[in-house]
């Protein structure tokens, strides 16, 4: 009876190659499932990965089978209704109560959707795939770095898909040569001695028999050295290295005025949390400036930005003025890629909206790489949206989007930050 001993150091990941192939094959269905799932959970809840469901029809394997048409001769077993040489009429509609002219059955049967779990890393990779900071100019190589996968030699651990056959066979040859070199040397000496004895007179039969036995034992020892061992296996190693890129800063401007009810604020926070996860996942170092505003604007830290309860009236231009001041003080446009994401319900003091238009057109949009405005409201658009629509027509680096319900957040986010052509 034969025994197989699994000596692989990475045995627990033996199905990883099949999992990766499955994720690649059904990526579109998985991404759609993730897009649906993100509306049902907090975007900060990523530690547990995500349960993904795929309709069973989408993963059915194609199969060849005979159609209902054509002429075929078959021999069927007989029974009490048919005897030899009887002919059986062709069933109508395939005879199965399925598609065609047959009748449907009264009992419906089916299969549940295929459900499986993806890890946190797989979840985030799929969530932010094909997204990037728009118009990123790669000219000042300092803090910001994108991660890219590079070959990094070989490793003794890995998944079967990354195995290096040539390097593994080289190691196998080196090991077998080292382990059998002394035995092969001794074997050559014994074979030479046996040749001398066979040609000598008188014959020394006992000595010849001893040499033949010793030669047989040495050959058996050499043959027992395995052709390949887990010690020989080498896998192509890959590592994520930070690629130098330009410095970048993201300004997050959030309206916290009294017109923003709690549901609207929650949607704005969910958008900004999604933005934060995207930046921290995709780029190594990005400065983030948080600005909250009502009648007055204030630069705050991350904790206060998301959790402060302060509120008041609405003057949107206060946030734009503060952003302009911070840019002039700390972020030279010649050295920084400047981005901004503004979220508001669109309710603003009427005389202030033209001022917002002027500030953006003359001071902010000429120096930023990309400015996005998200209006979160179920009401009709007001003067601020109309002023911003005019800016969108005049500036390519300005984009506006409308969010009505929580399920709009992720599609709007992908629309704003989908990958574009990068300037060099």
Curated annotation (Swiss-Prot):
Residues 92-105 have a biased composition (Gly residues). Residues 84-109 are annotated as: Disordered. InterPro entries: UPF0229 (IPR006698). It comes from the Bacteria. Belongs to the UPF0229 family. This is UPF0229 protein YPO2152/y2169/YP_1953. It comes from Yersinia pestis.
């Amino acid at each position: 009876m034969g025994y197989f001993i699994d000596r692989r150091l990475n045995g627990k990941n033996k199905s990883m190659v099949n999992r990766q192939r499955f994720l690649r094959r059904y990526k579109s269905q998985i991404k759609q499932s993730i897009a649906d799932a993100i509306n049902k959970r907090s975007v900060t809840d990523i530690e547990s990965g995500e349960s993904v469901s795929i309709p069973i029809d989408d993963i059915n394997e194609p199969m060849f089978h005979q159609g209902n048409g054509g002429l075929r001769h078959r021999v069927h077993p007989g029974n009490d209704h048919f005897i030899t040489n009887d002919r059986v009429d062709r069933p109508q509609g395939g005879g199965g109560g399925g598609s065609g002219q047959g009748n449907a059955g009264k009992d419906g049967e089916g299969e549940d959707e295929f459900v499986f779990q993806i890890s946190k890393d797989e979840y985030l990779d799929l969530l932010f795939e094909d997204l990037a900071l728009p118009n990123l100019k790669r000219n000042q190589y300092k803090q910001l770095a994108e991660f890219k996968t590079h070959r990094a030699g070989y490793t003794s651990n890995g998944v079967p898909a990354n195995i290096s056959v040539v390097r593994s066979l080289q190691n196998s040859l080196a090991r077998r040569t080292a382990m059998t070199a002394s035995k092969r040397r001794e074997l050559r000496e014994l074979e030479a001695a046996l040749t001398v004895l066979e040609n000598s007179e008188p014959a020394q039969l006992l000595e010849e028999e001893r040499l033949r036995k010793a030669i047989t034992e040495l050959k058996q020892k050499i043959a027992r050295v395995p052709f390949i061992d887990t010690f020989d296996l080498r896998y192509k190693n890959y590592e994520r290295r930070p690629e130098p890129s330009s410095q970048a800063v993201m300004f997050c401007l959030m309206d916290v005025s009294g017109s923003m009810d709690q549901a609207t604020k929650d949607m704005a926070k969910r958008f900004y949390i999604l933005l934060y996860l995207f930046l921290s996942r995709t780029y190594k170092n990005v400065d983030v400036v948080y600005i909250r505003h009502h009648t007055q604007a204030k630069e705050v830290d991350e904790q206060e930005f998301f959790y402060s309860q302060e509120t008041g009236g609405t003057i949107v231009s206060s946030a734009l003025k503060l952003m302009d001041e911070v840019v002039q003080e700390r972020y030279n446009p010649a050295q920084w890629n400047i981005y901004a994401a503004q979220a508001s319900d669109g309710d603003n003091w009427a005389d202030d909206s033209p001022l917002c238009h002027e500030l953006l057109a003359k001071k902010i949009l000429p120096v930023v790489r990309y400015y996005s405005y998200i209006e979160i409201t179920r009401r009709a658009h007001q003067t601020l949206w109309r002023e911003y629509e005019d800016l969108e027509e005049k500036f390519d680096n300005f984009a506006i989007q409308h969010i009505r319900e929580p399920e709009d957040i992720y599609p709007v986010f992908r629309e704003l930050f989908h990958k574009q052509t990068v300037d060099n």
